[in-house]
């Protein structure tokens, strides 16, 4: 990305002005104002042009925005929807995308289109577009396939997703850890630990290293399978190996403890990490309190919320209302306790 930016900086003002003059002189149903535009403005212009069927302008805008340092986003092809115009719009895009400047500009436009097609549930069309990329000798990368694998594994179409992997390999595109994580998360969400272990084996066989999301999925899987102790062991391994622990990983453990009825351990768990990361504290204490309230464990929830107040942690609207309605009237009693008595009080309440 930095190399691209340095390249753009080297472009002379005259060169950029020349591109803008060309854009203004070309026929278009969409008026393109001169000057540097924001990413959202480019997306708006592209969607206006696409909706009006002016795909020559779509092509020019896709070219010009990259030259001007404005990259495509998930909103770039928002005009492409599951309506009567879908087929004709897609064919027009397939026609103009090969005409975009080669290299990053064209590759990025294709990748964004594939992502849009997957969001619309058009997996077959996304694979057709990948075929276009391959025929056009564009460098296919694992990230090109990520939206497809994500979409299929979320819908638990695992066999279909593995067929896509076979197609990747036939085009000499290797799997990266992110691609494997989609399979891992799908299996772990359903508590399928054996299948998850098989995916982990494949990750290592391919020479990849599990990342934070890989371990996050494993913790989720252990909790969904009712093996909270195993989940906590995985979390400890992450810490020992220096792998960044995501906030969601803590949330998985808290969920497993609360759903297993281990309310005291839930508080003990969040207290063990308290004071190291203010945002983590807010997330973990708030998440635990919310879970307890939903399970109507009001007494335990009051203890957690009091802890949040004492630590000055951010509190959501629902917890704030819960606190104001149930907890603040007991503040005087809590304030009268010294630290040792307070810890004893919490232990007695939770056991």
Curated annotation (Swiss-Prot):
One of its GO terms (cellular component) is mitochondrion. Residues 1-27 form a transit peptide. It is found in: Mitochondrion. It comes from the Eukaryota. Keywords: Mitochondrion, Repeat, Transit peptide. Pfam families: PPR, PPR_1. Gene3D superfamilies: Tetratricopeptide repeat domain. Its main location: mitochondrion. PPR repeats lie at residues 106-140, 141-175, 176-210, 211-245, 246-280, 281-315. The keyword Nuclease does not apply. NCBIfam families: PPR. Belongs to the PPR family. P subfamily. This is Pentatricopeptide repeat-containing protein At2g40240, mitochondrial.
């Amino acid at each position: 990305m930095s190399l691209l930016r340095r390249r753009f900086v080297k472009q002379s003002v005259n060169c950029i002005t020349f591109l803008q003059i060309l854009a203004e002189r070309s026929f278009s149903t969409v008026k393109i104002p001169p000057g540097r535009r924001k990413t959202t403005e480019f997306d708006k212009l592209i969607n206006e042009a696409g909706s009006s069927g002016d795909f020559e302008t779509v092509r020019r805008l896709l070219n010009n925005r990259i030259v001007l340092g404005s990259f495509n986003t998930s909103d770039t092809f928002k005009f492409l929807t599951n309506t009567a115009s879908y087929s004709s719009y897609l064919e027009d895009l397939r026609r103009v995308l090969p005409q975009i400047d080669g290299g990053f500009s064209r590759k990025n436009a294709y990748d964004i289109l594939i992502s849009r097609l997957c969001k619309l549930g058009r997996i077959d069309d996304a694979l057709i577009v990948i075929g276009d990329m391959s025929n056009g000798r564009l460098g296919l990368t694992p990230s090109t396939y990520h939206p497809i694998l994500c979409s299929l594994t979320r819908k638990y179409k695992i066999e279909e997703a593995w067929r896509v992997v076979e197609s990747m390999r036939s085009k000499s595109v290797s799997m990266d850890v992110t691609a494997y994580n989609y399979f891992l998360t799908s299996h772990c969400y359903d508590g399928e630990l054996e299948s998850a272990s098989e995916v982990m084996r494949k990750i290592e066989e391919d020479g990849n290293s599990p990342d934070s999301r890989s371990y996050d999925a494993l913790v989720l899987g252990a909790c969904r399978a009712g093996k909270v102790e195993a989940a906590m062991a995985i979390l400890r391994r992450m810490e020992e190996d220096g792998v960044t622990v995501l906030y969601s990983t803590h949330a998985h453990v808290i969920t497993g403890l609360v759903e297993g009825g281990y309310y005291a351990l839930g508080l003990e768990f969040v207290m063990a990490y308290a004071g190291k990361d203010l945002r983590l504290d807010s997330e973990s204490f708030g998440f635990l309190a919310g879970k307890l309230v939903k399970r109507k464990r009001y007494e335990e929830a009051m203890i957690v919320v009091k802890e949040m107040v004492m630590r000055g942690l951010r509190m959501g609207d629902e917890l704030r209302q819960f606190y104001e309605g149930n907890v603040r009237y007991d503040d005087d009693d809590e304030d009268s306790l010294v630290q040792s008595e307070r810890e004893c009080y919490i232990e007695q309440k939770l056991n």
